[in-house]
C-alpha cells in the first residue's frame, strides 16, 4: 500500500489564489505522518483532494500507482478512510451503529449488516478498548470515546490509509494521550496514518514523519527530530520556544517549551 502526492496545486476558482502550491510527499506502510501548519494553510483542502472530494487539481495523487481522479468514491473508500474531528450527532445512534456505518462501501443499497459484519465491528471496538460501549449512545460518551468510535468505523471500512483531521481537537489531556496512543498502535500494525495537528509535541512523541505547510507550500519534510526546530516554529506559529531533549529511562524525545510571550504561572 502506498500513496504518492506529486506537485499538487489547487485553487477554489480559476483566478483565485493557490491554496496548495506544488505539494509533494509520499507515505508507505507503517508511516505516521503528522501534518503541521497554522490555520488556513490548506491542510484540510489537501485531505479533500486525497479523498477524491476535490478533483480539479493540478499535479497527481497516486494510490498504489493509480491516479485518484481515475477512481470512483467507492473504490477510493476501499483503501482510504477519513476520520473527522469528533462531533456531537444529530441522532443518538449506538456506538455499534456508528461503527457499522463503515460498511457503506461494502454493502449494496438497502442491504443490512449480517452477523459476520457485527463480529468485525466488535473486533474493531475491542482492539481500541471500547467494546464495552457498544450499546451506549454515541452522544452520551466522552469526546475521546467518540473519536475512538470513529476510528473503529474506519477499521471496519477495511481501508489501510487513515486520514485524520485534528483527531485530538477539543479533547482533554488524558483523552488526547489515549487517542494518540491508539493511533500510534495502528501505525505499528501497518496502517498508513496521515493526521493534521497544531501540536508539535504530537509529532515528536508519535510520528515518524512530519510535513510542515506554510503559505500553501511544504517548507519542511522529514523526521520530526530533524526538521522541527525553534526557528521553524517561530516562523510558522510566531512563538519563541526551546526544543529540548527529554529522557526517561531508555526513552528519548524532543519537546517544545515556550520561553516568552506572556507565558508564566498565575499567582
Predicted region positions:
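The feature captures the beta-strand-to-loop junction immediately N-terminal to the Walker
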Residues: 36-38
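ABC ATPase nucleotide-binding domains
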Residues: 236-267
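Catalytic Walker B motif of ABC-type/P-loop ATPase nucleotide-binding domains
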Residues: 162-166
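Conserved ABC ATPase "signature" region
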Residues: 100, 115-133, 158
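Helix-to-loop junction immediately C-terminal to a conserved catalytic motif
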Residues: 51
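Conserved ABC ATPase signature
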Residues: 137-141, 145
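Conserved ABC transporter NBD signature motif
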Residues: 59-67, 76
Amino acid at each position: 500500500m502506498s500513496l504518492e502526492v506529486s506537485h499538487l496545486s489547487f485553487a477554489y476558482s480559476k483566478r483565485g489564489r493557490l491554496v496548495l502550491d506544488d505539494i509533494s510527499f509520499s507515505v508507505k506502510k507503517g508511516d505516521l505522518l503528522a501534518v503541521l501548519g497554522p490555520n488556513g494553510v490548506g491542510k484540510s483542502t489537501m485531505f479533500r483532494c486525497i479523498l477524491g472530494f476535490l478533483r480539479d487539481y493540478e499535479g497527481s495523487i497516486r494510490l498504489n500507482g493509480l491516479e485518484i481522479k481515475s477512481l470512483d468514491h467507492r473504490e477510493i473508500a476501499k483503501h482510504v478512510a477519513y476520520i473527522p474531528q469528533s462531533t456531537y450527532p444529530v441522532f443518538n445512534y449506538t456506538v455499534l451503529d456508528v461503527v457499522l456505518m463503515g460498511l457503506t462501501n461494502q454493502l449494496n443499497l438497502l442491504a443490512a449488516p449480517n452477523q459476520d459484519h457485527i463480529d468485525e465491528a466488535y473486533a474493531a471496538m475491542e482492539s481500541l478498548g471500547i467494546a464495552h460501549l457498544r450499546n451506549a449512545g454515541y452522544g452520551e460518551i466522552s469526546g475521546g470515546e467518540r473519536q475512538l468510535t470513529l476510528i473503529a468505523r474506519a477499521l471496519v471500512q477495511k481501508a489501510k490509509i487513515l486520514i485524520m483531521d485534528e483527531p485530538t481537537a477539543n479533547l482533554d489531556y488524558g483523552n488526547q494521550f489515549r487517542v494518540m496512543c491508539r493511533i500510534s498502535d495502528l501505525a505499528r500494525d501497518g496502517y498508513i496514518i496521515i493526521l493534521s495537528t497544531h501540536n508539535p509535541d504530537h509529532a515528536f512523541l508519535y510520528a515518524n514523519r512530519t510535513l510542515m505547510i506554510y503559505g500553501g507550500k511544504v517548507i519542511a519534510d522529514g523526521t520530526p527530530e530533524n526538521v522541527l526546530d525553534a526557528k521553524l516554529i517561530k516562523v510558522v506559529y510566531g512563538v519563541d520556544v526551546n526544543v529540548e531533549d527529554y529522557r526517561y529511562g531508555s526513552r528519548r524525545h524532543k519537546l517544545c517549551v515556550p520561553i516568552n510571550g506572556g507565558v508564566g504561572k498565575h499567582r
